[in-house]
Amino acid sequence: MPQLSRYSDERVEELLTELASVLSKHKAPTDLSLMVLGNMVTNVINNSVAPAQRKTLARSFAEALQSSIRDDNAH
């Protein structure tokens, strides 16, 4: 079941496009891109979420990431 978001698809896509553009501009390979994005997620959680909620949010984020990964062969 899709999650409802308080943010519009347009706003999400705009941010995604900008982030992808920065990674492309720096010719970041997949491993570096994942490292940087992972560090960004960690930074957001550590600086914007109450300490008591961090582990729960990180677990939920990881589960959402796992559920969004496709099993097909597309690149």
Swiss-Prot record:
It comes from the Bacteria. InterPro entries: UPF0352, YejL_sf. It holds the Pfam family DUF1414. Coiled coil: none annotated. Belongs to the UPF0352 family. This is UPF0352 protein ESA_01049. It comes from Cronobacter sakazakii (strain ATCC BAA-894) (Enterobacter sakazakii). The lineage of its organism: Bacteria, Pseudomonadati, Pseudomonadota, Gammaproteobacteria, Enterobacterales.
